[in-house]
Swiss-Prot record:
Function, as annotated: Required for rescue of stalled ribosomes mediated by trans-translation. Binds to transfer-messenger RNA (tmRNA), required for stable association of tmRNA with ribosomes. tmRNA and SmpB together mimic tRNA shape, replacing the anticodon stem-loop with SmpB. tmRNA is encoded by the ssrA gene; the 2 termini fold to resemble tRNA(Ala) and it encodes a 'tag peptide', a short internal open reading frame. During trans-translation Ala-aminoacylated tmRNA acts like a tRNA, entering the A-site of stalled ribosomes, displacing the stalled mRNA.
Compartment(s): Cytoplasm
Keyword Transport: no
Organism field: Parabacteroides distasonis (strain ATCC 8503 / DSM 20701 / CIP 104284 / JCM 5825 / NCTC 11152)
Region called Disordered, residue ranges: 131-153
The protein's name: SsrA-binding protein
Annotated GO CC locations: cytosol
Amino acid sequence: MKEKISNNIQIKNKRATFDYELLDTFTAGIVLTGTEIKSIRLGKASLVDTFCIVEKGELWVKNMYIAEYFYGTYNNHNARRDRKLLLTKKELRKIEGAVRASGFTIVPTRLFINEKGLAKVVVAIARGKKEYDKRDSIRERDDRREMDRAFKR
């Protein structure tokens, strides 16, 4: 039951771009166990309903799903445990200052494996969209598609 391991892992949080207005992005390292990185390399992770918090000067990602590794034994990881993100102090201060301002949150938008084989998470400072903003986004996207179709003819 050996599964194909891809070198081009890109796990995206498509829901974040719909629910939030993304303002500023940062690329962060993530602290993982051995079975977690193996599951990510197999593409068995999800960023849906994931969020970040700043706690004691550290950034933590909460509710991120990484499936248990199929070949893992008794030392397999918990699928939804909290994971620490690695950023510079300057980036952490900037994020912490933005989160203290009302209405802002930190949302992971993408999980990928870089060229060195390390897992990285792209987090964004975001502001929640209202229902009418979401409808406007859908309307703009549909209009863009119709214009593209018209130009192709």
